[in-house]
Amino acid sequence: MKQYDIIVVGTGGATIVADAAIKVGKKVAIIEKGKFGGTCLTRGCIPTKVMVTAANAIQEVEEFKKIGVNVGDATMDWDTVAKRTWHMIDKSAGIYDYYNAYDNVDVYRGAASFVSDKVMNIH
């Protein structure tokens, strides 16, 4: 059975803890059952921001017309927006490579559950 100083379940916001532990030489386990990056990167904040940015740009074009700047009618190319969104999500693969490069980090794929107060199971 492997021993760790820190076990981080999920690769969302808790990776801040993993980063701090890695920097001071602690033995770290990271457990992720889904895409690396957590909810924010994969289906929350980042995808939403890509879509909101596109929508804001359309609105800005409409505002330009009010001050005499005419750039034509703005339209949304949903295929391009979707590609950009997936590009941002796919960058999460780099998070796995980042952590896997450290000798003091073990990355596990799966769900974690406690067996006892100091023992975890990955399934």
PLM regions: where:
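Glycine-rich flavin
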Residues: 2-4, 19-26, 31-123
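Beta1/beta-strand and adjacent pyrophosphate-binding region of the FAD-binding site
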Residues: 1-12
